[in-house]
Amino acid sequence: MYEAARVTDPIDHTSALAGFLVGAVLGIALIAAVAFATFTCGFGVALLAGMMAGIGAQALLSIGESIGKMFSSQSGNIITGSPDVYVNSLSAAYATLSGVACSKHNPIPLVAQGSTNIFINGRPAARKDDKITCGATIGDGSHDTFFHGGTQTYLPVDDEVPPWLRTATDWAFTLAGLVGGLGGLLKASGGLSRAVLPCAAKFIGGYVLGEAFGRYVAGPAINKAIGGLFGNPIDVTTGRKILLAESETDYVIPSPLPVAIKRFYSSGIDYAGTLGRGWVLPWEIRLHARDGRLWYTDAQGRESGFPMLRAGQAAFSEADQRYLTRTPDGRYILHDLGERYYDFGQYDPESGRIAWVRRVEDQAGQWYQFERDSRGRVTEILTCGGLRAVLDYETVFGRLGTVTLVHEDERRLAVTYGYDENGQLASVTDANGAVVRQFAYTNGLMTSHMNALGFTSSYVWSKIEGEPRVVETHTSEGENWTFEYDVAGRQTRVRHADGRTAHWRFDAQSQIVEYTDLDGAFYRIKYDAVGMPVMLMLPGDRTVMFEYDDAGRIIAETDPLGRTTRTRYDGNSLRPVEVVGPDGGAWRVEYDQQGRVVSNQDSLGRENRYEYPKALTALPSAHFDALGGRKTLEWNSLGKLVGYTDCSGKTTRTSFDAFGRICSRENALGQRITYDVRPTGEPRRVTYPDGSSETFEYDAAGTLVRYIGLGGRVQELLRNARGQLIEAVDPAGRRVQYRYDVEGRLRELQQDHARYTFTYSAGGRLLTETRPDGILRRFEYGEAGELLGLDIVGAPDPHATGNRSVRTIRFERDRMGVLKVQRTPTEVTRYQHDKGDRLVKVERVPTPSGIALGIVPDAVEFEYDKGGRLVAEHGSNGSVIYTLDELDNVVSLGLPHDQTLQMLRYGSGHVHQIRFGDQVVADFERDDLHREVSRTQGRLTQRSGYDPLGRKVWQSAGIDPEMLGRGSGQLWRNYGYDGAGDLIETSDSLRGSTRFSYDPAGRLISRANPLDRKFEEFAWDAAGNLLDDAQRKSRGYVEGNRLLMWQDLRFEYDPFGNLATKRRGANQTQRFTYDGQDRLITVHTQDVRGVVETRFAYDPLGRRIAKTDTAFDLRGMKLRAETKRFVWEGLRLVQEVRETGVSSYVYSPDAPYSPVARADTVMAEALAATVIDSAKRAARIFHFHTDPVGAPQEVTDEAGEVAWAGQYAAWGKVEATNRGVTAARTDQPLRFAGQYADDSTGLHYNTFRFYDPDVGRFINQDPIGLNGGANVYHYAPNPVGWVDPWGLAGSYALGPYQISAPQLPAYNGQTVGTFYYVNDAGGLESKVFSSGGPTPYPNYANAGHVEGQSALFMRDNGISEGLVFHNNPEGTCGFCVNMTETLLPENAKMTVVPPEGAIPVKRGATGETKVFTGNSNSPKSPTKGGC
């Protein structure tokens, strides 16, 4: 403020006047709302409430004015100054005499303020921020000359808000209270008229009620049961054909406040807009006067009546949650609780004309406006981002023909509209030139619409009770429905040709009050006086209650268990300031005067803060996490994130073209990815820093049909008219085929000789699944659609004549559908949850059949802090205690036997040191992308190097860090990749060179190591079964994906697909026994030396907690017995306990299943039994040297000596140890990621299954079925690039650029998903989220599911695009469909891919790929971020 002012320096006028008007609008609305609510309570109460509101309104005036004063624009310059005193060669300015040229005022205003103790030519020196007599301020000054002293006003300064306006507005506040009360009186007699029909989209995602209902009701059921929409869709209450604008979006003009060009259609609209009769565009909302009222026509063509308003008055529609205000200068402004302001300009209701919307703004001042011709048609759309759209009209009917984006001299066609001979919209052509929609009409009524792929929905009309109504619909796929209307009885029935019937009842306002679904499920809805649902009675004896405030906002929501969540809001908005859950946990948020989040707190009091630039924007410039870490964000004029700097000062930059399409992304190392995109934004080619690229081809609907990956590998996808996948062809030409019924439900999936078939209930739920080996799975559901039973009918035995084996599993759930009891033939498992639905205890009790198998009772308990974070888990082998920092990072892990692991972190959680007790395990160094480049390993140091694609290309360990590099050091390993990104060669200091080759689909076909003189060859059948020879002779040894023969091995299976017998030549036989959940219980191994019986025990979550080996000689004499016990950290083995000692495992902080070290300690009992010196009492630490997928290759001790080294066969069997070094000095059972080798069985325990390294596949079927892939025994295409740590579904692990569609595990009701995003390295990185368990966002009600957590992760980390693969066979639930777009940052995009063959069965599940985009009304993240 002390910068010296000079001639030519700018003067600025603030937006105080504009801000004052916003404050006035808010204040009038506030008083009017209070008066509405209190008028009937008596004049005294109304007066008191009005006085209180007046206090608030006057405060709003001040807030509005201060909002405006935050922002300024240049309005002129200083034009006169000192004749002989210069600053930076410019005349110095001084008060009382220096004049300015102001564009807003005449004659020449003077500088009014100046320094109290520095004078120029006897006059006070002027500085930056000193006032001008017209109310402006000096906007800039010298960068190196400063005039200090206080500030004194020497001349009068005009107020930027005129006194007359202050007086008028004060009067308006008083009048607003009176008129508000009258409005409340008039409301009962029709003074304020509700729309004749309810909002057609009121209950879908993105709308408050849709979001609330989506927590309890499936998305399709919300539309049908509550919204009254059926089919594609039809409004069953009126028989009108509608098309929701949410599914008819043609283009979004990028801007800080984006402009969506989307169409709404209703056959009930007689008005012919610029697209023809029945169609409405967003800019066709309007006001007009009729019958003594002001009628507002919204974007669905619905009319709502407001009373006539005088200047300074406002009215509020509770049903539609909108305010209409007439400002003192005669302008009409409509605004909603979403804080969008619609300016209709100055309007005289007596004129008879229409007042069209002319400008739209949000609370932050971001805007777009419409320029119109003399006919009221929009000719241009201007945006605050600088892009404009030009609208051209065809000449025959004057309809809208094209919308073209314009930036300076560059033009881009966004959408083209075509018309039939009657001027009705007939086609929509997108920016790519593809015809994406076609329509046909008869007598002005829509009779069909077709998508880009030819899927057609057709309609038959009949006049009933004087109105045209749809009486029949059919599709090009053969689906057919008929509609029966009882207008007088207010009910409608819809029938299918097979006899299924749905039935609705509705009230006089066309609100659904009862609905019976196709499967008999019954719904009932009760409403309050303004049409807001207050009670929702659902199938399964479930009731949901809602309470509202006077603005129609949900303030209390009580679920079917009687648990209530309460919400408070900020002002007259939908912004929550406090959400208190049923468990008492509270989330709070604070906003600034523009409605932007400035801070939030969770139940633990952890605070996140946001900073914003001094500009009209809702986009934050900085985010401070709960530890004070600062991340900065830079945005371009279109609202695109162009710079993200983490709290370590590392920056990622993204560039966009003038039309908002991504061009490139550059990481902190300067590595750049470039994008060639289609006009609609999808990538055509992505080129990586090394010059390699991927290309994408799309059909007319914009869905991917051909993908050419790295190395030129081609995948092709064939789709039906619905866009559903009907054939997938991999790069090797193998095909997976899909067949659907007329309603789009998957009926058959075939991969070569392997075939799955499916049947469904009347309500569309999956009833049966038949697998390739003949196993039949039958599903049973409750009234609420929850799964209650599963019958598994074993595969038919061609040699047996009796009935097939049947296994029955039963589920008991509470009224929220949460699993409480699971009953299997061998055990009963009970689940306990707290009020936040967090799992607190799982208890197992064996049945008599289970006791016979040796299963014993067991329990696991969990503890959480006030923030809902998991802090402890207790099991039969001890407790694991988590100490978390403010960002939810584990900083200490307490283990049984008094052991502790500590992680020292920097930034938002990057680990730089790991300690075991007082001993340092490893110190880490990282590069600018936070990747590990160095770690200590006792006396050794290991360094790593990466290629431009982020893949590890070398690692080297040795005593002298300075001597480490590619091919040097004590232990070194180099990696080579082919053009497709597959690992083709490893060379290391112990094993020499090992080469790998692959088929075109990336499946391993050979492995060769000249040093070992071993060459392995493999082949694959079309169903993904690994065969043991390249000539495919063993093809006949696979039936129904069950492997029967492999070299000298022979396999037999039980009826449920579990390996029952394995024979190795004539000398070894193994027999396997399983429990009621197909978990391996015993292995009986007999060979020429005798018998080994191996028995396994599991906790109630299915984690192996004990293994006992008992050896017998050939006479049956017991030789020895050994038991090992296991402790788990979540789903990761953390401790192995033997009679004499404990081994604790430490994993990489960057690769969760790649071991870093093992700490071996002697048990206390052994210490007490023998004399051991103090040096041996400390842990003995061994260090792992792993390959890129985390498989241990060597183990060294603290002195740097090799204690173990393994020689692997292709599929993970260690055939020799310590080649080229001394004898092994320690056992090392870890193998591929998540695997533990059992010497007694030859199998690898793989968390939820056992893996057989002899044949490279699992011994039983995937617990998650098709979610893990079409072949339920399959491990991975190749074991050197893929991992499957849970034994459920493989995922690609070599580099950040290729991604698979891994399907992750569901257990105990959890949905697990992997979120992929572009990291600071410019590559794809992954993060696993799960529902039903610990989450990084435990205190945000909308982040319980994978999609919500991914969306918040995107927001908190400045990520503009992400991809989610999840395991839920029910697809994306209605809650996530409804909420994710609200959670996403503005303009961000997230694609959610369900498991293969996902089928909706409950809670809004949708088994299709969903694309979510963020909107500008979404609340800012209430959670932490990461660097």
Swiss-Prot record:
Q: Where in the cell is it found?
A: Membrane
Q: By what name is this protein known?
A: Double-stranded DNA deaminase toxin A
Tell me what topology the record assigns in the membrane: Multi-pass membrane protein
NCBIfam families hit by this protein: Rhs_assc_core (TIGR03696), YD_repeat_2x (TIGR01643)
State the organism of origin: Burkholderia cenocepacia (strain H111)
Query: Pfam families, from UniProt?
Result: DddA-like, DUF6531, PAAR_motif, RHS, RHS_repeat
Q: Which gene encodes it?
A: dddA
Query: What cellular-component terms does GO give this entry?
Result: membrane
Q: Which InterPro entries match?
A: DddA-like (IPR032724), DUF6531 (IPR045351), PAAR_motif (IPR008727), RHS (IPR001826), Rhs_assc_core (IPR022385), RHS_repeat (IPR031325), T6SS_VgrG/RHS (IPR050708), YD (IPR006530)
